[in-house]
């Protein structure tokens, strides 16, 4: 799958990022998201595959494109036999976030990316559109920390695993009312807290790399983004655990959420027998082959955002493969048709 789809999915996230970046700093998060979705879908439909969106922009009633269950790729066309040989057909599940951090783009802030993860059919959990408690940590702490441990214990384990003091650690937490106690506990343990308004896929990813200055992600965010984070961290050999959160009193979202029993019933109808299960990243992204790709829209810990110049644009993309055990950083110059850039600089 890596050999067949690696370059294609790079182009998918690149085009989504370029489209969204045109709206960076313009205060219009909806349009930034819309153009990213359109660009990503157009590129996906040019790939020789039969893909199914398992995590996307919502249900078919909620989203006209990249909705859950939508089929994408050349091999989904009515005339697919002209382009796809059945014996070579690649069937995959796709999790997408064409513009993670739409508000970040609208405000011109750091941390927004165009993201997708793919695996063979059935290889990614079809996470419901609810919340998830998350714990992301470096590879050195994998299997040692646990989402049920108090923050102080996990921080001590991470510090020991990285051969440093707790006071050296930085933990990313989403700036939400529900996290006030978590933030207090992290600070009392001696670690530093980096509060973010959006973009916890980017934060989880940063925790999986050495040298980013981020050592953990803790707290509650969206469940679909948790599956995408799990796919990336599984490829990296890093730690990720998640637990679905559906109690309105815990989430404190400020919007309507169904009663607990109603959500539990719906989860069981979708095949999730234990709604309170702790999911390991190998369960959230269980496929034999998992591929993750992200292109920076705005600058982040790992990648620079899209930069425009007279003859085109420049992007930085991260591609991680569980199959080839590789991490690639791809620096791409996109030249407009019929134009030559005035001059290429190394950085």
Swiss-Prot record:
Pathway: Carbohydrate biosynthesis; Calvin cycle. Its EC number is 3.1.3.11, 3.1.3.37. One of its GO terms (molecular function) is fructose 1,6-bisphosphate 1-phosphatase activity. Pfam families: FBPase_glpX. GO terms for biological process: fructose 1,6-bisphosphate metabolic process; gluconeogenesis; glycerol metabolic process; reductive pentose-phosphate cycle. It is an enzyme of class 3 (hydrolase). Mn(2+) 2 binds at residues 97, 100, 225. GO terms for cellular component: cytosol. Keywords: Calvin cycle, Carbohydrate metabolism, Hydrolase, Manganese, Metal-binding. SUPFAM superfamilies: Carbohydrate phosphatase. PANTHER family: FRUCTOSE-1,6-BISPHOSPHATASE 1 CLASS 2-RELATED (PTHR30447:SF0), FRUCTOSE-1,6-BISPHOSPHATASE CLASS 2 (PTHR30447). Belongs to the FBPase class 2 family. Catalyzes the hydrolysis of fructose 1,6-bisphosphate (Fru 1,6-P2) and sedoheptulose 1,7-bisphosphate (Sed 1,7-P2) to fructose 6-phosphate and sedoheptulose 7-phosphate, respectively. Homotetramer. This is D-fructose 1,6-bisphosphatase class 2/sedoheptulose 1,7-bisphosphatase. It comes from Synechococcus sp. (strain JA-2-3B'a(2-13)) (Cyanobacteria bacterium Yellowstone B-Prime).
């Amino acid at each position: 799958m890596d050999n067949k789809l690696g370059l294609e999915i790079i182009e998918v996230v690149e085009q989504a990022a370029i489209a969204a970046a045109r709206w960076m700093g313009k205060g219009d998060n909806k349009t930034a998201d819309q153009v990213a979705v359109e660009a990503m879908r157009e590129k996906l439909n040019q790939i020789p595959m039969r893909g199914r969106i398992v995590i996307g922009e919502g249900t078919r009633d909620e989203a006209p494109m990249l909705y859950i269950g939508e089929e994408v790729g050349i091999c989904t066309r009515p005339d697919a036999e002209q382009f796809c040989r059945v014996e070579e057909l690649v069937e995959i599940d796709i999790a997408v976030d064409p513009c993670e951090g739409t508000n970040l783009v609208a405000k011109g802030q750091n941390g927004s990316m165009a993201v997708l993860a793919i695996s063979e059919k059935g290889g990614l959990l079809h996470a419901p559109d609810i919340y998830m408690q998350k714990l992301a940590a470096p590879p050195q702490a994998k299997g040692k920390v646990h989402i049920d441990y108090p923050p102080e214990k996990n921080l001590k384990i991470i510090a020991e695993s990285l051969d440093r003091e707790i006071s050296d650690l930085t933990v990313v937490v989403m700036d939400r009312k529900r996290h006030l106690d978590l933030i207090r506990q992290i600070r009392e343990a001696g670690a530093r807290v980096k509060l973010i308004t959006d973009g916890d896929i980017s934060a989880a990813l940063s925790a999986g790399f050495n040298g980013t200055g981020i050592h953990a992600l803790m707290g509650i965010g969206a469940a679909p983004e948790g599956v995408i984070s799990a796919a990336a961290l599984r490829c990296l050999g890093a730690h990720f655990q998640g637990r679905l959160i559906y109690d309105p009193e815990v989430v404190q979202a400020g919007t309507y959420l169904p009663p607990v029993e109603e959500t539990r019933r719906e989860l069981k109808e979708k095949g999730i027998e234990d709604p309170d299960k702790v999911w390991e990243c190998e369960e959230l992204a269980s496929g034999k082959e998992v591929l993750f790709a992200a292109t920076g829209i705005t600058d982040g810990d790992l990648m620079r955002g899209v930069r425009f110049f007279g003859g085109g644009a420049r992007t930085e993309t991260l591609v991680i493969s569980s199959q080839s055990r590789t991490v690639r950083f791809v620096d791409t110059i996109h030249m407009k048709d019929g134009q030559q850039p005035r001059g290429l600089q190394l950085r």
